[in-house]
Amino acid sequence: MDIRDYPAIDVHAHYGDYHRDGCSDLQNQMASGDAGTVVARARRANTQWTVVSPLSGLMPRGRADAAAGNLEAARIVPETEGLLQWVIIDPGREETYQQAEQMLGEPFCMGIKLHPEEHCYPITEHGDALFAFAAERRAVVLVHSGDENSLPEDFLPFAERYPETRVILAHLGNGGGAAGDPTTQVRAIQASTKGNLYVDT
């Protein structure tokens, strides 16, 4: 059987309106798509399940409402065949911890999404609280990685300290601003001793 005959699972996707300051309207439009659009694109690529977080909970940078985004996703995802949810935790929004506590018990929620860049915090300062929370719930954690607040090597101590978590470093090859050193995620995984650090493409 050809590998292309197997349905895929996309563990890192978003739905909603993309807005990056400094991007053209066309770039923002091309990166946008409602839940139905995301599923339609996935189907064309033989992707059976797509795990999403809402862009409204991440963007615009430093101004997104993660709590409102989580509520939106908890409504939209169960109604959209082919989608599953990451619940977003923003350490600056205490209510997102409470939402995660509740949503992690739902069959459509696969784990926790962290985005230190969009929520403007260094993972080195907030990682212990975030990963202790995740470890207590044995949660999978998808993290943006490769930029100033989210260097892959900065996640390694938390993955080591909290082996109950499974941590996915997003953006294989992102060494900063979608450029830089393309080996940073791989080197962090090579240094891991607990076998709980992964990467997505």
Q: What is the meaning of each model-derived region?
A:
Residues 1-129, 133, 137, 191-194, ...:
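Mid-domain alpha/beta scaffold segments of enzyme catalytic cores
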